[in-house]
């Protein structure tokens, strides 16, 4: 009996230490209530295979360990040394880095499940989690698929079908075209009838893939083709639907659970309105400003949606909501969501444990009336991306990674450690920072406090952007909607952020003290007592020494006149402002800290020097100050080569629109690159004629590689 096996496993392991990342906000006794219902016959689950990678694989493995269920990981060649491989009881290689040859290879995963004797497969999210064929294949092979039946995945995965089912179930839907005629002309005609702006959406899938907003007929064709390519790449299906685009809506979703006995409940709503590239970046539960009556109606509509397709397991019903709190069905995600931890935090539940128990044949652990809603939770997604460059995803090693401490109201969901690499082949998410407090304002304060403690060096991240976002007055007021980032672009992404002179003094002080440390180390180990490198500080008895230092903020050089004083302090002058500076470096927990006093104001910052850049992290924020490198030592400029275009990141050339000899205008599309599962269009930087195209379709281009070269313009005579 599946449920009995699971309960016995829990009993055997009840004295194990619960991983701190999964400790609940309060010591609720919900686990005792999960055992009130009788068990039902089913297949025994003693071992589960996780058909995924990264943080969600780690998340499932932790709960499996807590329940005494053995875990089996799968990994691609790129993930051989990854965190989820180390955490699992067993791990199996399933192929090369590209997901089509590994994490999307159904037959390989089924074969691993058989050879490892895993009775169940947890698909996580993404990859095969909403693949009807995979769910059906598991059933045929006698393997429990931890998710809904394939019929529910089919009905909810095809958006046109799901809209019809929802309308029949009495769930409000948005006006649109969901027909079988997929010709460009038909879609264009319906877009015109609906009225611009419209949303082009992939019939299958989700996560912002294959989705485009079209504001005029002139741009319809290009956006349609782009959405088709991305949908084909992500879901192997380029069918599209057209919907009326609701300006400044809220994205509100409801967590639901169903079981094999016909029961269904909702675990309240989440607000996921704040997005970039149609992907969520910060989520919260419950949704701000929603009164109990609207909350009940949302939940009941979501349960009707789940029951309409005989839903089993974890699912999310997504709605768009207007300013008057009218809501309309958007789609149903037939899997566990990325943002599920905020629901766990406000309800005191472990949704992965619910998934495993329900898959084993148990009833839903709690009735609707027993599910509590207490406090407020936020989740911030920390990505390897450059917000100042249109959120361009990045890849590379996490040279330095330090995080806030996990406690009963703070969770860090991650699949990487310091020294690991964010791969170009997969989603660039580094971690999810999840916090809980008794009310929204307290939770928001805790989120900002923890973000200040999330320090990353080695690649660009969005941590500073998340700090600006969470500190914006309109966000604090709960006035969120899907256009929040574009509407507040100037506040969230300032074009010129000036570094305070005090921060420049901190960087200069850190470099001087680091120089002294290196000099002392040299003197300690050198055999040449008369080496000039033994005397580099410039300090002499009864003499003040002055030197000029040049640091760089962005593209601007900053000259600091530094005077070494006899008492060990420094006088620094930047422009016409003077500072008295003193301090020291110390080491704590493997990190270097700079303690400084600048004009009598004490500061403490984490100090990291990497690749001619000083990184300072403190509770006031983070800054980067560059150390200029002579031009003859500099690499090729990232602005371009030979007046052409360069690859903004490492990726695959998906489409090439031009050839040598073509004339183009500034803004014309030259190529399409695929990286981090996202499509990026390379535009012409100027008018001109193409001299050379360096890559063909399907080729791999490294970051900063020249893509297209323009002919030299003839000078005016």
UniProtKB/Swiss-Prot annotation:
Modification note: Acetylated.
Record key words, sorted: Acetylation, ATP-binding, Biotin, Ligase, Mitochondrion, Nucleotide-binding, Transit peptide
Pathway in which the depicted protein is active: Amino-acid degradation; L-leucine degradation; (S)-3-hydroxy-3-methylglutaryl-CoA from 3-isovaleryl-CoA: step 2/3
Domain Biotin carboxylation: 45-490
Mitochondrion keyword on record: yes
Keyword Acyltransferase belongs to the record: no
Annotated positions of the N6-succinyllysine modification: 577
Native organism: Mus musculus
InterPro entries associated with the record: ATP-grasp, BC-like_N, Biotin_BS, Biotin_carboxylase_complex, Biotin_carboxylation_dom, Biotin_COase_C, Biotin_lipoyl, CbamoylP_synth_lsu-like_ATP-bd
Protein name: Methylcrotonoyl-CoA carboxylase subunit alpha, mitochondrial
Annotated ranges, domain Biotinyl-binding: 622-711
The protein's required cofactors: biotin
Residues of the transit peptide: 1-38
Lineage per the UniProt record: Eukaryota, Metazoa, Chordata, Craniata, Vertebrata
UniProt record, GO biological process: L-leucine catabolic process
């Amino acid at each position: 009996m599946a449920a009995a096996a699971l309960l016995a496993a829990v009993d055997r392991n009840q004295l194990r230490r619960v991983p701190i990342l999964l400790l609940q906000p309060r010591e609720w006794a919900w686990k005792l209530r999960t055992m009130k219902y009788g068990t039902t016959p089913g297949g025994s689950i003693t071992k589960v295979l996780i058909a995924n990678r990264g943080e969600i694989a780690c998340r499932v493995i932790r709960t499996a360990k807590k329940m005494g269920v053995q875990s089996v990981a799968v990994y691609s060649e790129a993930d051989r040394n990854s965190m989820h491989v180390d955490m699992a009881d067993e791990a199996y290689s399933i192929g090369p880095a590209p997901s089509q040859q590994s994490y999307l290879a159904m037959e390989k995963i089924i074969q691993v499940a058989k050879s490892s004797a895993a009775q169940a497969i947890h698909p996580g999210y993404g990859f095969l989690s909403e693949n009807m064929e995979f769910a059906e294949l598991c059933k045929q092979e006698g393997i429990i698929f931890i998710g809904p039946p394939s019929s529910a995945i089919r009905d909810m995965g095809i958006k046109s079908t799901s809209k019809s089912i929802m309308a029949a179930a009495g769930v409000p839907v948005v006006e649109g075209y969901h027909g079988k005629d997929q010709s460009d002309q038909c879609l264009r005609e319906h877009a015109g009838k609906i009225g611009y702006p419209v949303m082009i959406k992939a019939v299958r899938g989700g996560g912002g893939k294959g989705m485009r907003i079209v504001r005029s007929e002139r741009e319809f064709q290009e956006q349609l083709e782009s959405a088709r390519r991305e949908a084909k790449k992500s879901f192997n299906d380029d069918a599209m639907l057209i919907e009326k685009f609701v300006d400044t809506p809220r994205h509100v979703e409801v967590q639901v659970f169903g079981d094999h006995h016909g029961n269904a409940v909702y675990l309240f709503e989440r607000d996921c309105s704040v997005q970039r590239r149609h992907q969520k970046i910060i989520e919260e539960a419950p949704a701000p400003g929603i009164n109990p009556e609207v909350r009940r109606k949302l939940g009941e509509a979501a349960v009707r949606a789940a029951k309409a397709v005989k839903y089993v397991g974890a699912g999310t019903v997504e709605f768009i909501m207007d300013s008057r709190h009218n809501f309309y069905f958007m789609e149903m995600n037939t899997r566990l969501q990325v943002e599920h931890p905020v629901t766990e935090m406000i309800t005191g539940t472990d949704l992965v444990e619910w998934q495993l128990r329900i898959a084993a044949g148990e009833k839903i652990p709690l009735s609707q009336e027993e599910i509590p809603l207490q406090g407020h939770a936020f989740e911030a997604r920390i990505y390897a991306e450059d917000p100042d460059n249109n959120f361009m995803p990045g890849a590379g090693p996490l040279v330095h990674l330090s995080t806030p401490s996990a406690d009963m109201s703070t969770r860090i969901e991650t699949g990487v450690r310091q020294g690991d690499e964010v791969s170009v082949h997969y989603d660039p998410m580094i971690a999810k920072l999840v916090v809980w407090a008794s009310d929204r304002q307290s939770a928001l304060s805790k989120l900002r406090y923890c973000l200040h403690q999330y320090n990353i060096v080695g690649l660009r991240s969005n941590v500073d952007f998340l700090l600006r976002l969470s500190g914006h007055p309109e966000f604090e007021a709960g006035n969120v909607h899907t256009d929040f980032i574009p509407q507040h672009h100037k506040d969230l992404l300032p074009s010129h952020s000036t570094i305070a002179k005090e921060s420049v003094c901190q960087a200069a002080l850190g470099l001087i003290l680091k120089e002294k440390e290196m000099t002392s180390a040299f003197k300690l180990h050198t055999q040449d007592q008369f080496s000039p490198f033994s005397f580099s500080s410039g300090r002499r008895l009864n003499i003040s020494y002055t030197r000029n230092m040049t640091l760089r903020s962005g593209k601007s050089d900053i000259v600091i006149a530094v005077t070494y004083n006899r008492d060990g302090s420094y006088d620094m002058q930047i422009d016409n402002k003077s500072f008295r500076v003193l301090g020291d470096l110390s080491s704590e927990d493997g990190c270097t800290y700079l303690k400084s006093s600048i004009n009598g104001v004490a500061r403490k910052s984490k100090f990291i020097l990497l690749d001619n850049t000083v990184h300072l992290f403190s509770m006031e924020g983070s800054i980067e100050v560059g150390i200029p490198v002579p031009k003859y030592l500099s690499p090729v400029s990232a602005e371009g080569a030979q007046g052409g275009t360069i690859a903004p990141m490492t990726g695959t050339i998906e489409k090439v629109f031009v050839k040598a000899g073509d004339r183009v205008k500034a803004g014309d599309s030259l190529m399409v690159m695929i990286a981090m599962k996202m499509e990026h269009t390379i535009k012409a930087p100027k008018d001109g004629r193409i001299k050379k195209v360096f890559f063909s379709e399907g080729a791999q281009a490294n970051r900063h590689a020249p893509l297209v070269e323009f002919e030299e313009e003839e000078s005016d005579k």
